[in-house]
Amino acid sequence: MKQITIASRESKLALWQTNFVKNRIQSELNIPCEISTMKTQGDIILDQPLNKIGGKALFMKELEVAMLSNKADIAVHSLKDVPYQLPQGFCLAGFMPREDPRDAFVSNKYNSIDDLPKGAVVGTSSLRRKAQLLHYRDDLEIRDLRGNIQTRLSKLDNGDYDAIILASAGLIRLELVERITQFIPVEISLPAVGQGIVVIEALERDNDLLEKIQKLNCRESSRVATAERAFNQELKGGCHVAIGAYAELDNNQITLMAMVASSDGKKILKRKMIGDDPTKLGKLLAQEMIALGAYKILES
């Protein structure tokens, strides 16, 4: 293979992730790479919540079009931005090692969620974070926050918010870990499906490339991500509902923790299950939670 062209969004975090994959391909597979950057609709439409404008697929469509038109061979994504169902002909070809999956509490004035005064304004665009935060502290005011990491931090620094919630992984990767005031325990805020994992998307028809990319695959990331995504798929969850799932691998045993909540955080259901087949585990836990009223909670 002469060269691999990688499609990427233009943000600093997207380029960090893409360069991470590029460097691994070049050093471990000995194949030269180039990066092709592009803006997605998710990057352009910043004045509306994601759940109102089409969801996570808005961060991927342009990259997938580039692959279909032979302008790129693969695309690199943050797995939490990848819908549970990919368009026909696409697949997830390689999972990178997971960074810290927890949500991060970021504030210039307060040390933790517990330190926030009544009525404090917290910024997040995630229904999952909003619901869990309100369940823990129903006296807070949650306001939407869109944009890349730098934009969100500048809005905090300008005084628009008392605190904001971001993914720890992105801040760590951009060497902004000093901005994290508190790593939020998963007992308070269960992470998004796939949070902290960088993934490579490719075309199913490209067997030669898939075989090469598979050599970069992190087995642990792949197994825990498969469990989390199977849970999400069984529930048919997207960014328009408050769903969280986080799996840990110990030897061959996977512990999957999951949460569904109403958007106001007043109703919440959490469950845990252990198994060794990630797809089966995710489906079984989702079915158990559906039997316990998960859909009614998500609709409320």
Swiss-Prot record:
Database matches in Pfam families: Porphobil_deam, Porphobil_deamC
Protein's gene: hemC
Required co-factors: dipyrromethane
NCBIfam families attached to this UniProt entry: hemC
Its job: Tetrapolymerization of the monopyrrole PBG into the hydroxymethylbilane pre-uroporphyrinogen in several discrete steps.
Stated name of the protein: Porphobilinogen deaminase
Organism of provenance: Francisella tularensis subsp. holarctica (strain LVS)
InterPro entries documented for this protein: HemC, Porphobilin_deaminase_cofac_BS, Porphobilin_deaminase_N, Porphobilinogen_deaminase_C, Porphobilinogen_deaminase_C_sf
PTM sites of type S-(dipyrrolylmethanemethyl)cysteine: 239
Substrates-to-products reaction catalysed: 4 porphobilinogen + H2O = hydroxymethylbilane + 4 NH4(+)
PROSITE patterns: PORPHOBILINOGEN_DEAM
Family according to the record: Belongs to the HMBS family.
